[in-house]
């Protein structure tokens, strides 16, 4: 624990020369509002918001370039509260600064329908750049924002001197001990150093207290040394009241352009709560009426009043609105001058901000003739990306060290990064479009979210479907935010073969489909893959993330695939030859991905027994379920109860479509190490097995 002598030193104020009494009053107002808000609702996290009051005030009122009247301003600095549990750290600044929150919003913290939920939520509260709460995600996504900022500079103003472009700005982060403990921040911080992201400035609130009290029980490392080892520019500031040290550290960080900056700020959580500061009780619970009253007495507030804000304090802090507009106007002059110099790049920016695709963008998408050589859908996806590359400069992405397997490299594209990281295989350029995440799947997921949130480019990242498990927290958060991230997940079943059960996805398709707002797209062949990419890129403005599920093994190019059908999520690929117009089939075979070919072959076997089968390709259940009832009933007539679903994964998500009388050809156990043909045969993924299931469904 921190000694009383250390607490005294850490809480000794150091203010710059232009700091006034009203600045101190504003900081104390933040502390009291945080204590009052949590006390009123009865739960929450007051301590960090209290001890970080000087830092938050300094960032929002004295450092960051932003305009409270336009929270979407292209030239703004971004702020990420990775320590999302301390949401009041952000909310109170948004209130004081005039971003759209009022005192009543602070009073309604964590209540139904309020603008101030327990953790900050993107799209919900003006001024919130990203949903945070699951620790580590914010810092990792901020790395993506910093990468996006550089890539966008390359698209729009590549030749400007550092700091001279209207597209230059900073990404500021506040991270906690918990953020630092999470593995995703280690992954992302390592990559940030590789990328030399000089526009990223992270404040680490080193208060050494968590829910279980003193973090020494679980965190003993020299975190600053760890970040130095990564290659970050590292500074240490003693004391959360040390505004002079905070501002000096910010200035130093801004001057370092070839490395991200890490500022370890030693604070005393809950200061100035006399009995609970520097304890776990200040972290995640209301302080209690007596302790809140004691805090108010210490800072000169009336202990019998709640939510006190002096009029002169609010007038002072709301002055940020005018200052922000002035900064915006100065920036606008620079932006307008750039627009006159760069009319073509300005047109590109306008198109991206309008979320439009260029005319003819999909005219050169590859097409494969039915019956041509079998092709893995991952290979088809790679061909599609290379065709799209010249038309869509906003499209960029890569892989978690599996580019050759995922086929995620756009042909001819340089790698993104400082030239110094170039290898024999890859030429890096500051503004390249091929991303190398390394074996950092979790960070990749969070970084993609940061890129998309920063806007306005489109980013994708690839790995094996099995390793989507490593990405799941970031994927869920992207779905919660309804942002348009793209995940390319290949090697999608036991069909990957010899790598064996550790790498063969079994439960993954159903597990991913369980995430609300995530679209899981598993095309049947090369053409469906092209149609899927077309649909994914045409979906914008909060359509939600998409996981594109692709095969390792070759699959035949099928007859009858349909672009509109793919966009609708499911469609009739083939009806039995003897079926008359308007006549319903005897049985419906529903399949996805590499198993659609089995349904087509089973249709022929069933026809030999005078059973008329319909084959439905269902690349995306989520898109299909969003269609009108009329369309869904036309594809899957309710009167046809004999149904079979075929997918090389667990059956869990298919019962809703096949019903109690239907059959599911699935795999409910882990695989083995063997070639894909052997595995499909031994585990019952054959045309004969599908036909037999159809006959059972007819008998049910």
UniProtKB/Swiss-Prot annotation:
The active site is at 441 (proton donor). Keywords: Calcium, Magnesium, Metal-binding, Thiamine pyrophosphate, Transferase. It is an enzyme of class 2 (transferase). Binds 1 Mg(2+) ion per subunit. Can also utilize other divalent metal cations, such as Ca(2+), Mn(2+) and Co(2+). The keyword Transferase applies. Its cofactor is Mg(2+); Ca(2+); Mn(2+); Co(2+). It comes from the Bacteria. CDD domains: TPP_PYR_DXS_TK_like (cd07033), TPP_TK (cd02012). Disulfide bonds: none annotated. GO terms for biological process: pentose-phosphate shunt. GO terms for cellular component: cytosol. One of its GO terms (molecular function) is transketolase activity. Pfam families: Transket_pyr (PF02779), Transketolase_C_1 (PF22613), Transketolase_N (PF00456). Its EC number is 2.2.1.1. Thiamine diphosphate binds at residues 48, 85, 133-135, 178, 207, 283, 467. InterPro entries: THDP-binding (IPR029061), Transketo_C/PFOR_II (IPR009014), Transketolase-like_C_2 (IPR055152), Transketolase-like_Pyr-bd (IPR005475), Transketolase_bac-like (IPR005478), Transketolase_BS (IPR020826), Transketolase_CS (IPR049557), Transketolase_fam (IPR033247). Catalyzes the transfer of a two-carbon ketol group from a ketose donor to an aldose acceptor, via a covalent intermediate with the cofactor thiamine pyrophosphate. Homodimer. This is Transketolase. It comes from Mycobacterium bovis (strain ATCC BAA-935 / AF2122/97).
């Amino acid at each position: 624990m921190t000694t009383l002598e250390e607490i005294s030193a850490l809480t000794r104020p150091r203010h710059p020369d232009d700091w006034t009494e009203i600045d101190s009053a504003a900081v104390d107002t933040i502390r009291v509002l945080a204590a009052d808000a949590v006390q009123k609702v009865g739960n929450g996290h007051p301590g960090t918001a209290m001890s970080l009051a000087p830092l938050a005030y300094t960032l929002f009122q004295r450092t960051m370039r932003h305009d409270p009247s336009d929270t979407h301003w292209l030239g703004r600095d971004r702020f990420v509260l990775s320590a999302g549990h301390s949401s009041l750290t952000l909310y109170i600044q948004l209130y004081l600064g005039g971003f759209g929150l009022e005192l009543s919003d602070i009073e309604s913290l964590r209540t139904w329908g309020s603008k101030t939920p327990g953790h900050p939520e993107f799209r919900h509260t003006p001024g919130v750049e990203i949903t945070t709460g699951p620790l580590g995600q914010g810092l990792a996504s901020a790395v993506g924002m910093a990468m996006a900022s550089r890539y966008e500079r390359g698209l729009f103003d590549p030749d400007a001197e550092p700091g001279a472009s209207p597209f230059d700005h900073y990404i500021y982060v506040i991270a906690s001990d918990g953020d630092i403990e999470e593995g995703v921040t280690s992954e992302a911080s390592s990559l940030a150093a590789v990328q030399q992201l000089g526009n990223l400035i992270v404040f680490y609130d080193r208060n050494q207290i968590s829910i279980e009290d003193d973090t020494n029980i679980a965190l003993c490392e020299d975190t600053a040394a760890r970040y130095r080892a990564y290659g970050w520019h590292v500074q240490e500031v003693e004391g959360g009241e040390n505004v002079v040290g905070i501002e000096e550290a910010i200035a130093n960080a801004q001057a370092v352009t070839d490395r991200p900056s890490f500022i370890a700020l030693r604070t005393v959580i809950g200061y100035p709560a006399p009995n609970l500061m520097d304890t776990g009780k200040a972290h995640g619970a209301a302080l209690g009426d007596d302790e809140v009253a004691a805090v108010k007495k210490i800072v000169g507030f009336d202990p019998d009043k709640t939510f006190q804000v002096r009029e002169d304090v609010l007038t002072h802090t709301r002055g940020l609105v005018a200052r922000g507009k002035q900064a915006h106007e100065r920036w606008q002059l620079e932006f307008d001058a750039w627009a006159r110099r760069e009319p073509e790049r300005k047109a590109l920016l306008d198109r991206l901000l309008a979320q439009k695709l260029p005319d003819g963008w999909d005219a050169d998408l590859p097409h494969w003739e039915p019956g041509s050589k079998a092709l893995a859908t991952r290979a088809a996806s790679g061909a599609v990306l290379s065709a799209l590359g010249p038309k869509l400069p906003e499209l960029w992405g890569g892989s978690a060290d599996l580019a050759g397997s995922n086929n995620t490299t756009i042909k001819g594209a340089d790698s993104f990064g400082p030239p110094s990281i170039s290898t024999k295989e890859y030429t890096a350029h500051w503004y390249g479009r091929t991303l190398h995440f390394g074996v950092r799947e979790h960070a990749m997921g969070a970084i993609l979210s940061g890129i998309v949130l920063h806007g306005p480019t489109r980013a994708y990242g690839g790995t094996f479907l099995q390793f989507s498990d490593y990405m799941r927290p970031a994927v869920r958060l992207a779905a919660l935010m309804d942002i348009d991230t793209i995940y390319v997940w290949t090697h999608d079943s036991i069909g990957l073969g010899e790598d064996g059960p550790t790498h063969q996805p079994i439960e993954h398709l159903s597990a991913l489909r369980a995430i609300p707002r995530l679209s899981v797209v598993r095309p049947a062949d090369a053409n469906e893959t092209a149609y899927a990419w077309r649909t994914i890129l045409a979906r914008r403005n909060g359509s939600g993330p998409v996981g594109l599920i692709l095969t390792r093994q070759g699959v035949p190019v099928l007859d009858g695939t349909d672009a509109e059908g793919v966009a609708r999520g499911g469609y009739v690929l083939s009806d039995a030859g003897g079926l008359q117009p308007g006549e319903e089939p005897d049985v419906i075979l529903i399949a996805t991905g590499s198993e659609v070919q089995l349904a087509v072959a089973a249709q022929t076997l069933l026809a030999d027994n005078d059973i008329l089968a319909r084959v439905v390709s269902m690349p995306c259940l989520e898109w299909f379920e969003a269609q009108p009832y009329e369309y869904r009933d036309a594809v899957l007539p309710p009167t046809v109860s004999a149904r079979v679903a075929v997918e090389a994964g667990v059956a869990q998500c298919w019962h809703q479509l096949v019903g109690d009388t239907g059959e599911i050809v699935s795999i409910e156990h882990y695989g083995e190490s063997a070639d894909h043909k052997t595995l499909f045969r031994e585990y019952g993924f054959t045309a004969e097995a599908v036909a037999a299931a159809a006959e059972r469904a007819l008998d049910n």
